[in-house]
Amino acid sequence: MQADDGAPAAADDEATADAPRRGRPRSEKARLAILEAAAELLLARGLSAVSMDAVAERAGVSKATIYRWWPTKETLALDALYNEWAAVQPRTRSTGTLRGDLLGLLRPWVRLASSRPYGRVIGALVTEAQTDPEFAEIYLSRFVEPRREQARVIFRAAIERGEIPADTKIEVAVDMLYGPLYHRLLHGHAPLNERFVRDVVDTTLRGIMPSQEHAT
């Protein structure tokens, strides 16, 4: 992973290491200020505007302070995005039906991704993950995999209810859900909206629900 600017000097690292432990509340305040500054730059001007220098200046901290938590601007950007999304998480309480649960999973993500600043940032992070293996590992583990696991839980519950066959290929079903969303997000050829979410869910269900045609 390429650094966007020079790493802090060793003296800065030593000063940080020697900081008194009683300063933890201040450290947390600094961490939140860094996340807020990074999010402001990210949403206003995109990933390219997020540099350690720019974030440090905006947050009123040293670069050494930033490097204590984030080794690169990409990991900082990902955490800043998570901090912004904290209040927009898909509901986890079951509706009692597979369709209802899948709609509840996808709607919050699509509402956020379809807004211009967030959609642009997600697209930039996906692009970065294609060219930077180290960042790709972080992106997959922290952004992609948790959402896939939420979908797996929903499909497993549907199998237990007898709503879909026990031999349903869950990984393929998860791909069927998220694939169309990312395709529209990255290419921008058609809108990401509520109707599209319903169409994706219903088309996925038609592909995995038992039918007389498949029973023979």
Where are these regions (language model features)?
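Short hydrophobic/aromatic patch on the recognition helix
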Residues: 60-70
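Short amphipathic alpha-helical segment with a characteristic S/N-K-E followed by hydrophobic residues
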Residues: 34, 49, 72-77, 86-88, ...
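C-terminal peripheral helix-coil segments that are non-catalytic and often amphipathic
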Residues: 1-20, 100, 104, 145, ...
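Hydrophobic alpha-helical connector segments
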Residues: 90-119, 173
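Tryptophan-centric aromatic hotspots in well-structured domains and transmembrane helices
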Residues: 69-70, 139, 143, 178, ...
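Amphipathic alpha-helical segments used for helix-helix packing
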Residues: 80-81, 113-138
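Basic, helix-initiating cap at the start of DNA-binding domains
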Residues: 1-60, 75
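Amphipathic, non-transmembrane alpha-helical scaffold segments
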Residues: 27, 136, 140-148
